[in-house]
From Swiss-Prot:
The gene is aroA. Pathway: Metabolic intermediate biosynthesis; chorismate biosynthesis; chorismate from D-erythrose 4-phosphate and phosphoenolpyruvate: step 6/7. Keywords: Amino-acid biosynthesis, Aromatic amino acid biosynthesis, Cytoplasm, Transferase. It is found in: Cytoplasm. It comes from Citrobacter koseri (strain ATCC BAA-895 / CDC 4225-83 / SGSC4696). This is 3-phosphoshikimate 1-carboxyvinyltransferase. GO terms for cellular component: cytoplasm.
Amino acid sequence: MESLTLQPIARVDGTINLPGSKSVSNRALLLAALASGTTVLTNLLDSDDVRHMLNALSALGVSYTLSADRTRCEITGQGGVLHAEGALELFLGNAGTAMRPLAAALCLGANDIVLTGEPRMKERPIGHLVDALRQGGAKIDYLEQENYPPLRLRGGFSGGHVEVDGSVSSQFLTALLMTAPLAPQDTTIAIKGDLVSKPYIDITLNLMKTFGVEVENQNYQRFVVKGEQQYRSPGQYLVEGDASSASYFLAAGAIKGGTVKVTGIGRNSMQGDIRFADVLEKMGATITWGDDFIACTRGELNAVDMDMNHIPDAAMTIATAALFAKGTTTLRNIYNWRVKETDRLFAMATELRKVGAEVEEGHDFIRITPPAQLQFAEIGTYNDHRMAMCFSLVALSDTPVTILDPKCTAKTFPDYFEQLARISTPA
């Protein structure tokens, strides 16, 4: 297996221009494909997950052109439902942001489509979404294990009243919301359980509005969407920088700044993960907000005990930043870490112990007490881009760290390690 050893870093200082947001990129691609008119997306993320979405749209007859660096995409919208010519199988890797929305959107109209992916994708639950789509008339079969991909979709979704469990993943609701306007009837979506990762729903609603569709949001408990609508291209659309990706650089600034500034997001960003900066501030770092940047300057860091449900992806970065804070850090209400690219609660606890931390792994929380001295370790990354990026922060000590399978960052940030090196001064 490939590995990368990071030598100790004495100081970080500089500016990072963030790649486009994964959450925004894949939503925007799908809406542009469904819309009438041509859409030019700029600052699109070039990563595995986005390539899976693009390949799927291409197989569904959507035409687009990409710039050489794959960050500008001009898409010709279909002005409605996506149709496959005959039976089709789409391979979506481990891209939840492609699997969930496509599973819903391809239940409109008459299709016969199989959605499949990597072995890990077949372990990521999709039953709550399928249940909701079936209530709206969709014909869906599980081809292997009940409640998990691969799925066979044969159209039939017509709207009406559907209930969806919101306690596992907000992507199920996102998928229903983006599909509902194209259904023949109005759709009312009622949420069962507590809705996790609410800010991701705001991204969805924001993008739908950009493409000309309004949703009635009744306090995140019920959503009412009129049927027989059409998405309309906004013409040009700039994809915000990825706020989850920003978290590693901002944390590095908090631990070993200098000052690290990330551009492409700012105080008015639609991504909930910008709230990560508030956590660093609470720990003792200094944060400066601009319209198009967030900057973090080093501070004496103290442990925090916080509910992290609103920023599940960025919260992982706090788990490794906790190694540099005084006291015991507790991250709560993060059950949905368990259904991401890997079981992130287990993975994080296991790897933090390797570098010497004392860790308590709960059902939906993690408690971390840093050691007096970090130990050198080879960090397993579980084919999870965020594990690789989180543990790069260990090098901000006087101990090197080895990251196994470093290329797994390609899911969202192919040149992450080069960017980190660019702002680092070796010890």
